[in-house]
Amino acid sequence: MAAVFDLDLETEEGSEGEGEPEFSPADVCPLGELRAAGLETVGHYEEVELTESSVNLGPERIGPHCFELLSVLGKGGYGKVFQVRKVQGTNLGKIYAMKVLRKAKIVCSAKDTAHTRAERNILESVKHPFIVELAYAFQTGGKLYLILECLSGGELFTHLEREGIFLEDTACFYLAEITLALGHLHSHGIIYRDLKPENIMLSSQGHIKLTDFGLCKESIHEGAITHTFCGTIEYMAPEILVRTGHNRAVDWWSLGALMYDMLTGSPPFTAENRKKTMDKIIKGKLVLPPYLTPDARDLAKKFLKRNPTQRIGGGLGDAADVQRHPFFRHINWDDLLARRVDPPFRPSLQSEEDVSQFDARFTRQTPVDSPDDTALSESANQAFLGFTYVAPSVLDSIKEGFSFQPKLRSPRRLNSSPRTPISPLKFSPFEGFRPSPGPPEPMEPSLPPLLPSPPSPPPTSTAPLPIRPPSGTKKSKKGRGRSGR
């Protein structure tokens, strides 16, 4: 079976308790009591019916029933994103974002399967102040669920739309936090490859968080290259477009395009269609507005060097070379990493449940996670083995006991981004999710996170119970934003 069902068994000499007397169930409990309890003995063994209640003996079983839907935050072809509240177990009352994906739509598309697997694996393995945190991952017969920290500040795209352009000090702050996040990914051999305002969220305090890791490439260390054609055209480096092979330097080109976008109102190379946009990226002239300071002009030029070996950040120094540029001379990097620097913008939020920074077209909808009775074949389900995950911080809190901490611009289009990503197609559809390196993973779909148990039977066609609807009357909430990916 997949690694998710691997159990570490005692194999050392003497682990069987040499010299200790053998015993039977009758030595522990009289036979009559065993039969009264519904257990029958066969020789020295007992037969016990395996049910959900008999194998789920841990302090918490994670599943859709643990969350109450509050609002719809976004919607796409892959599924929905909800704001939810945890109503059972550890972190009772905490607000999360819940991404729900339909398995049937994912398995029929190579790129969506690759996207989902990459995002799930990277969210588990990478922890950083400026990268979104994954709390839980679980699945039912027809759906996948990712429970993420709720970033109520909305997308940087929305904020940039409202402001038009940023002052250099504002742009410097966001670019510096993004630089630290990219540097951390690169140190783990991960290329991000889809940096754009839509994939950068703001926390309630105004700090950035990178999201959407489906186009990432893993295991790309110094000297390694990859050839996959993917990303969002306006932010794609020329070496991706000409398919000569690329490495982590593509992220610094994208950061340069984002910097240009922040300071001028649009990416550096745009046209009426993708073909002409690509031509401009490959051979067009970079035009910088005269109002940029010399440091900003110099950094933008160095980010947007077409030769990746000449691009700032493209050498061995990676993010360290970017951090040393005079544009960031006023940044205290230690304070920035510790989030001791006040953000230039702090979202105006009335409560943890405030969704005013998201698109009102979605937040006005009644949140419903409809039952899905789709039954996938055994071979199709192979793509989702090992999906379940519980964050180590959650496991720690389970061990310690329950905690309660309810804690004027025309080029852009706010309704939906005109920039759609191109996903990679090179992958093995049955390459499973990486098993957690830490505590044992809960059994599929929602078995206990702490106690190892026998593997559960494969999913049946029985539809899972829908997540409970919000109590009371749905309040109308105002706000703007754009949908999911």
Swiss-Prot record:
Keywords carried by this UniProt record:
ATP-binding, Cytoplasm, Kinase, Nucleotide-binding, Nucleus, Phosphoprotein, Serine/threonine-protein kinase, Transferase
Post-translationally, this protein is described as follows, namely: Phosphorylated and activated by MTOR. Phosphorylation by PKC within the NLS in response to mitogenic stimuli causes cytoplasmic retention.
Give the highest taxon in the source lineage.
Answer: Eukaryota
Reaction(s) catalysed by this chain, per the record, are:
L-seryl-[protein] + ATP = O-phospho-L-seryl-[protein] + ADP + H(+); L-threonyl-[protein] + ATP = O-phospho-L-threonyl-[protein] + ADP + H(+)
**Residue positions of the active site:** 194
Described purpose of this protein according to its UniProt entry: Phosphorylates specifically ribosomal protein S6. Seems to act downstream of mTOR signaling in response to growth factors and nutrients to promote cell proliferation, cell growth and cell cycle progression in an alternative pathway regulated by MEAK7.
Q: What's this protein's name?
A: Ribosomal protein S6 kinase beta-2
The root-end lineage is:
Eukaryota, Metazoa, Chordata, Craniata, Vertebrata
